[in-house]
């Protein structure tokens, strides 16, 4: 097997990784500090003087973190007592072991980008955890909820579209296929709403995405939806398969999560799947990633919406969860810095859970980076090989491109894109639905 290429890293000056560590991450830390400042009176009302002291302590820890990052200090071990602390510190040791004699310690602008960026979010969590009684405060909650409220028009249009299709069982097979393709594309473009890319600024969806699909089609660089349809429609017709399980590894809350829930509802209603398992994060992560609280909050707010299409969908989704047809899982592995190819060793229980799926949909850029090991693969390198042996079940990456990493393109395709749009890899303007089928 050929040697794997180098990791993406901020040591490549001018690269997207470099600009993220230099500009976007300090901006996110500043926003987190501002959020804590703004909630000072709320902390006082809830916890008295203790709340004020906790806010000061958290801000002090976060300011120290920002300074370490901006001055390229060595990465230090975590000191909290969480379930994953020892795994993080072991991984830091592993990063240290990869360095050559003159390299010094793992540092922000030198070590793999995936490691240091994940580490920053884990340190934010540590700062809050070390500041009781505000230790369960989600510093990103506000911006996630804002994204949902600002996207109401698009959410209403999408829910109305879904309800018009019901009962889905009454549709002809070609109609089901057509809608399946449509809702996969909506889930793809919903991935544009990423608050970590915008430094935590508003990134809501205000246009009716259904009307834009035709115009957006040329921006899908790899479209394996036919293969997904072939897999699920075949399973549906296989009498020996009474259970068809689809897992969705979630990315962003807000509008993107709604697009995932609408897709899941359609899969269930059309009997392309009999159960859906959602996987989210166990701690606040990368600004807008879904936690269990976000998942339940969205379903609850959909259900209590004064817009009929939204409340109908919300009630429906709550019923699916109550019946056990939909299940939400989280696992500490999703917020570790490890590439997914080591999941069987690091989190064998999670890998075994994913092996129960007939199809896994991995949403978003961070999942793609972890699937690919965040390495500088050639653009034409095969997707299956870049997965480095990770294959719990047939899987598909659904992401808009927000980092300098993409495999499986046709020869000449990347060069053509670079000539017409030099920033095609990082703006979220282009997307992929990239499938790795049954072995």
Curated annotation (Swiss-Prot):
Residue ranges of the motif Subfamily III RTxK motif: 399-402
EC number per UniProt: 3.1.3.-, 2.1.1.-
Annotated substrate binding sites: 251-252, 365-369, 402
Residues where N6-acetyllysine is found: 40
Enzymatic reactions: beta-D-fructose 1-phosphate + H2O = D-fructose + phosphate; beta-D-fructose 6-phosphate = dihydroxyacetone + D-glyceraldehyde 3-phosphate; L-glutamyl-[protein] + S-adenosyl-L-methionine = [protein]-L-glutamate 5-O-methyl ester + S-adenosyl-L-homocysteine
Record PTM N-acetylalanine, positions in chain: 2
GO molecular function, one term: S-adenosylmethionine-dependent methyltransferase activity
Protein name per UniProt: Damage-control phosphatase ARMT1
Organism from which the protein derives: Mus musculus
């Amino acid at each position: 097997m050929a040697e794997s290429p180098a990791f993406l890293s901020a040591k490549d000056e001018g690269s997207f990784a470099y600009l993220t560590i230099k500009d976007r991450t300090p901006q996110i830390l500043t926003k987190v500090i501002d959020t804590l400042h703004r909630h000072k009176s709320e902390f006082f009302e809830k916890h008295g003087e203790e709340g004020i002291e906790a806010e000061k302590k958290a801000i002090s820890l976060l300011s120290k973190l920002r300074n370490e990052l901006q001055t390229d200090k060595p990465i230090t071990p975590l000191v909290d007592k969480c379930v994953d602390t020892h795994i993080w510190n072991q991984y830091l040791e592993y990063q240290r072991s990869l360095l050559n004699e003159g390299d010094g310690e793992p540092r922000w602008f030198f070590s793999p980008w995936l490691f240091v960026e994940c580490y920053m979010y884990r340190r934010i969590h540590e700062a809050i955890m070390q500041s009781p009684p505000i230790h369960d405060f989600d510093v990103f909650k506000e911006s996630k909820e804002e994204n949902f409220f600002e996207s109401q028009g698009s959410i209403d249009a999408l829910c109305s579209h879904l309800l018009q299709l019901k009962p889905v069982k009454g549709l002809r097979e070609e109609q089901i296929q057509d809608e399946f393709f449509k809702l996969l594309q909506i889930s793809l473009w919903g991935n544009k709403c990423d608050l970590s890319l915008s430094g935590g600024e508003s990134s809501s969806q205000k246009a009716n995405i259904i009307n834009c699909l035709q115009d957006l089609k040329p921006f899908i660089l790899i479209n394996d939806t036919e293969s997904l349809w072939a897999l699920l429609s075949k399973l549906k017709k296989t009498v020996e398969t009474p259970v068809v399980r689809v897992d969705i590894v979630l990315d962003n809350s807000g509008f993107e999560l709604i697009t995932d829930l609408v897709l899941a509802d359609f899969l269930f209603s059309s009997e392309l799947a009999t159960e859906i398992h959602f996987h989210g994060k166990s701690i606040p992560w990368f600004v807008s990633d879904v936690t269990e609280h976000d998942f339940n909050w969205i379903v609850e707010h959909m259900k209590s919406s004064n817009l009929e299409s939204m409340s109908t969908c919300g009630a429906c989704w709550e019923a699916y969860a109550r019946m056990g047809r939909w299940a939400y899982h989280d696992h500490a592995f999703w917020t570790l810095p490890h590439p997914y190819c080591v999941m069987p060793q690091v989190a064998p229980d999670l890998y075994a859970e994913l092996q129960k799926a007939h199809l896994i949909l991995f949403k978003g850029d961070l999942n793609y980076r972890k699937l690919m090991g965040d390495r500088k693969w050639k653009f034409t390198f095969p997707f299956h090989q870049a997965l480095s042996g990770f294959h719990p079940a047939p899987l598909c990456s659904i992401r808009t491109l927000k980092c300098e990493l993409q495999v499986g393109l046709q020869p000449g395709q990347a060069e053509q894109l670079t000539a017409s749009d030099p920033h095609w890899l990082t703006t979220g303007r282009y997307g992929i639905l990239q499938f790795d089928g049954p072995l």
